[in-house]
Swiss-Prot record:
This is Matrix metalloproteinase-23. N-glycosylated. Proteolytic cleavage might yield an active form. Residues 298-383 form the Ig-like C2-type domain. Its cofactor is Zn(2+). Protease. May regulate the surface expression of some potassium channels by retaining them in the endoplasmic reticulum. Its EC number is 3.4.24.-.
Length: 391
């Protein structure tokens, strides 16, 4: 595939070609749906589908009506999430090639310029560097603009097809696959995302969407921090820069280490304050940029009173039940693995329900699982299980 294997040694036997192949990373043009809602168009079904990021119907033009105020509520503060297998690259000097270009608006030269700007957003604040190579050369990342039916999307269970204009904009694959696909039905531009009344179409910011998908290609899932570029609704919010949330995600995935030997000297000279952008990329450890995030998914949890240890054979299906006897008190269940929040199900790894969690025992799923039942800020119950796989 033109890229090196990057799985942890203990996970290499458990993770096959389909392990999370297609990143659960499609980015939808929620701003289009938001505007149509603002104009009073009947988009409730499309809005719900887009939030779930599956089977969103195509959204066409609508008859303008008297604008209504569109309000959005944020119920809780969130943060980054990583893949359950911690999929990552084993090197920082990544290459990419562009296999096809958009047919609407942007020329190949403009497309290359936009992609380079998106890659710079990551290289400016991380140890990664990105270099374009010729299409016939092997590369780590492979970028293309494709129609609805592209590559193996019709036969693959983990790679879905595009849905036409104003739906899913792009999707990416986790390491070490390196694929980044853009919907060629969209109208890509280098400016801000906006609706063109002259053309009657949405013009979508290529740099913004590409930067989001690059984050997935580096191993980050959708962030739950509202101000993060990796947020599912990043297009709607219009964030144009990486947040501290993405940096913490990279630190957690790749380690937080100084990249050059003069970091300690630079830190003593005050560079951590006056050259913060440079020091975040080169010297995060010396400048104490590795500290833990200040925005927990929920309020700080209390330590479980008891952790049950289970030694199970590989391949066994295990189910944990949490707080079934107290759910009638209208408590909400939060699941964690090794103190990381679990927000989604992952086919072949774990199935997340309201009050239960099922996993397939393997090297990837080893760890400590915790559930916390809360009602508002009050902890109603806490349970914890430590899973070890028997060879």
């Amino acid at each position: 595939m033109g890229c090196r294997a990057c799985l942890r040694p203990e996970a290499s036997g458990a993770v096959q070609g389909r392990w999370l192949g297609a990143a659960l990373s499609g980015l939808c043009l929620l701003s289009a749906l938001a505007l149509l809602e603002w104009l009073g168009a009947p988009t409730e079904t499309a809005w719900r589908a887009a939030q779930g990021n599956v089977d969103a119907p195509n959204v066409g033009s609508s008859t303008a009506q008297v604008p209504r105020l569109l309000t959005m509520s944020v119920t809780r503060r969130r943060r980054y999430t990583l893949t359950p297998a911690r999929l990552r690259w084993d090197h920082f000097n990544l290459t990419y090639r562009v296999l096809s270009f958009p047919r609407n608006l942007l020329s190949p030269e403009e497309t290359r310029r936009g992609l380079a700007a998106a890659f710079r957003m990551w290289s400016d604040v991380s140890p990664f560097s990105f270099r374009e190579v010729a299409p016939e050369r092997p590369s780590d990342l492979k970028i293309g603009f494709y129609p609805v039916n592209h590559t193996d999307c019709l036969v693959s269970a983990v790679h879905h097809c595009f849905d036409g204009p104003t739906g899913e904009l792009a999707h990416a694959f986790f390491p070490p696959h390196g694929g980044i696909h853009f919907d060629d039905s969209e109208y890509w531009v280098l400016g801000p995302t906006r609706y063109s009344w002259k053309k009657g179409v949405w013009l979508t910011n290529l740099v913004h969407v590409a930067a989001h998908e690059i984050g997935h290609a580096l191993g980050l899932m959708h962030s739950q921090q509202d101000q993060a570029l990796m947020h599912l609704n990043a297009t709607l919010r219009g964030w144009k820069a990486l947040s501290q949330d993405e940096l913490w995600g990279l630190h957690r995935l790749y380690g937080c280490l100084d990249r050059i030997f003069v970091c300690a000297s630079w830190a003593r000279k005050g560079f951590c304050d006056v050259r913060q952008r440079l020091m975040k990329r080169l010297c995060p450890r010396s400048c104490d940029f590795c500290y833990e995030f200040p925005f927990p998914t929920v309020a700080t949890t209390t330590s479980p009173t008891r952790t049950k240890t289970r030694l199970v054979r590989e391949g066994r299906n295990m189910t944990f039940h949490c707080g079934q006897k107290i759910l009638h008190k209208k408590g909400k269940v939060y699941w964690y693995k090794d103190q990381e929040p679990l927000e989604f199900s992952y086919p072949g790894y774990l199935a997340l329900g309201e009050a239960q969690l099922s996993i397939i025992a393997n090297a990837v799923n080893e760890g400590t699982y915790t559930c916390v039942v809360r009602r508002h800020q009050r902890v109603l119950s806490t349970y914890s299980w430590r899973v070890r796989v028997r060879n």
